[in-house]
Amino acid sequence: SAHAADFVWRAGGAIALHQQLGYEVTIVCLSYGERGESAKLWKEQGATLDKVKASRRNEAKAAAQALGAHDIQFFDLGDYPLEMDRQAKFQLADLMRAVQPRFLMSHSLYDPYNTDHAYATQVTMECRMIAQAWGHNPGEQVLGAPQLYLFEPHQTEQMQWKPDVFLDITSVWDRKRAAIECMAGQQHLWDYYTNLAQNRGNHFRRNSGGQAGGRSARYAEGFQSVYPRTVDEL
């Protein structure tokens, strides 16, 4: 997550669902989004950078708790622009090794409105590569080949994002909505992402069979996978 709230809108359902299924989900916020994604907080009297960052941290921690996430970590790298030096990349790669994730989630590969998002995904792929390298901290367990799912951006057509996976999040929707409402600094997005989940629920129903026996998902999230999936049968 490039900023502290991104995981809530775009992958909150996936986080809550997989935690419920027995996974231990780790959330990484590369920044708090304190400069560029906290307009409501900056309009408050007496706002300072430290106060805004503290508010965003508290909101994100509350949202992660609402989703039941196993862990949330804040790298506090700053935003607008988000930048990571070699040491920060090693920090993320080492975390990937420690967690050994079954899969990863990040932003779309392209975002002309918010370059922090695309940068976060570029770095995620780079750190995945580093974590797979036997010559990085020799002797440690290297990372396998977890799939990278790109969660849905705000304006899909502009971001050249095309979903190939729909995830039914109906059973955990209440958790996601509770997490959404933790993000007081971006209240203008609450209803938008509720409507989006309903629309993706419609797409889930249609793509699972529609009126010919499709599953009755009310809420869903969409993802675009980066790497091929290896299967034993179709």
Question: What are these model-predicted stretches?
Answer:
Residues 1-99, 232-233:
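Active-site rim/loop-helix segments in enzyme catalytic domains that contact anionic ligands
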Residues 71, 82-234:
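Metal-dependent de-N-acetylase/amidase catalytic core
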